[in-house]
Amino acid sequence: MKTGIKKVKLHVKKNDSVVVISGNDKGKAGKVLRVYPQKGRVIIEGVNIRKRHMKPTQSHPQGSIIEREFPIHASNVKKS
Protein backbone atom coordinates (compact mmCIF):
# COMPACT_ATOMS: atom_id res chain seq x y z
CA MET A 1 0.00 0.00 0.00
CA LYS A 2 1.41 3.38 -1.04
CA THR A 3 1.35 6.33 1.30
CA GLY A 4 1.98 10.00 0.72
CA ILE A 5 1.54 12.19 -2.31
CA LYS A 6 3.54 11.77 -5.49
CA LYS A 7 5.54 14.79 -6.65
CA VAL A 8 4.83 16.00 -10.16
CA LYS A 9 7.75 17.18 -12.31
CA LEU A 10 6.93 20.71 -13.39
CA HIS A 11 8.19 22.63 -16.42
CA VAL A 12 8.58 25.88 -14.45
CA LYS A 13 10.86 26.83 -11.58
CA LYS A 14 11.05 29.70 -9.12
CA ASN A 15 11.92 33.07 -10.74
CA ASP A 16 10.90 31.90 -14.26
CA SER A 17 8.87 34.44 -16.22
CA VAL A 18 5.61 32.88 -17.42
CA VAL A 19 2.35 33.75 -19.21
CA VAL A 20 -1.07 32.41 -18.20
CA ILE A 21 -2.63 30.56 -21.15
CA SER A 22 -6.08 29.73 -19.75
CA GLY A 23 -8.49 30.79 -17.04
CA ASN A 24 -9.67 34.16 -15.76
CA ASP A 25 -6.16 35.63 -15.88
CA LYS A 26 -5.42 34.51 -19.45
CA GLY A 27 -2.74 36.66 -21.09
CA LYS A 28 -1.26 38.01 -17.86
CA ALA A 29 2.49 37.64 -17.36
CA GLY A 30 4.53 37.45 -14.20
CA LYS A 31 7.36 35.83 -12.29
CA VAL A 32 6.98 32.51 -10.45
CA LEU A 33 7.18 33.22 -6.72
CA ARG A 34 6.65 29.70 -5.38
CA VAL A 35 6.20 26.15 -6.70
CA TYR A 36 4.15 23.37 -5.07
CA PRO A 37 5.30 20.14 -6.80
CA GLN A 38 3.05 17.90 -4.65
CA LYS A 39 -0.05 19.74 -5.89
CA GLY A 40 1.23 20.70 -9.34
CA ARG A 41 0.53 24.38 -8.69
CA VAL A 42 2.50 27.63 -8.85
CA ILE A 43 2.09 31.14 -7.44
CA ILE A 44 2.72 33.92 -9.97
CA GLU A 45 3.40 37.54 -9.08
CA GLY A 46 0.34 39.73 -9.79
CA VAL A 47 -1.84 36.85 -11.04
CA ASN A 48 -4.91 35.23 -9.41
CA ILE A 49 -5.23 37.94 -6.74
CA ARG A 50 -7.88 37.21 -4.12
CA LYS A 51 -9.00 38.90 -0.93
CA ARG A 52 -8.13 37.13 2.32
CA HIS A 53 -9.94 38.00 5.56
CA MET A 54 -7.55 38.02 8.52
CA LYS A 55 -8.57 37.49 12.15
CA PRO A 56 -8.03 40.29 14.65
CA THR A 57 -4.56 40.27 16.24
CA GLN A 58 -2.73 42.57 18.63
CA SER A 59 -1.15 44.44 15.72
CA HIS A 60 -4.52 44.71 13.87
CA PRO A 61 -7.29 44.72 16.51
CA GLN A 62 -10.00 45.27 13.88
CA GLY A 63 -8.77 42.45 11.68
CA SER A 64 -8.08 43.18 8.03
CA ILE A 65 -8.70 42.22 4.44
CA ILE A 66 -5.53 41.71 2.40
CA GLU A 67 -5.08 40.94 -1.29
CA ARG A 68 -2.59 38.22 -2.16
CA GLU A 69 -1.69 35.81 -4.93
CA PHE A 70 -3.18 32.33 -4.83
CA PRO A 71 -1.83 29.24 -6.65
CA ILE A 72 -2.92 28.22 -10.14
CA HIS A 73 -2.35 24.89 -11.85
CA ALA A 74 1.00 24.61 -13.65
CA SER A 75 -0.69 23.35 -16.84
CA ASN A 76 -2.28 26.79 -17.24
CA VAL A 77 1.06 28.59 -17.67
CA LYS A 78 3.89 28.56 -20.20
CA LYS A 79 7.40 30.00 -20.07
CA SER A 80 7.93 33.28 -21.88
Curated annotation (Swiss-Prot):
One of its GO terms (molecular function) is rRNA binding. GO terms for biological process: translation. The keyword Hydrolase does not apply. The keyword Methyltransferase does not apply. Gene3D superfamilies: 2.30.30.30. SUPFAM superfamilies: Translation proteins SH3-like domain. InterPro entries: KOW, Rib_uL2_dom2, Ribosomal_uL24, Ribosomal_uL24_CS, Ribosomal_uL24_KOW, Translation_prot_SH3-like_sf. GO terms for cellular component: ribonucleoprotein complex; ribosome. Residues 53-80 are annotated as: Disordered. Keywords: Ribonucleoprotein, Ribosomal protein, RNA-binding, rRNA-binding. One of two assembly initiator proteins, it binds directly to the 5'-end of the 23S rRNA, where it nucleates assembly of the 50S subunit. One of the proteins that surrounds the polypeptide exit tunnel on the outside of the subunit. Part of the 50S ribosomal subunit. Belongs to the universal ribosomal protein uL24 family. This is Large ribosomal subunit protein uL24. The gene is rplX.
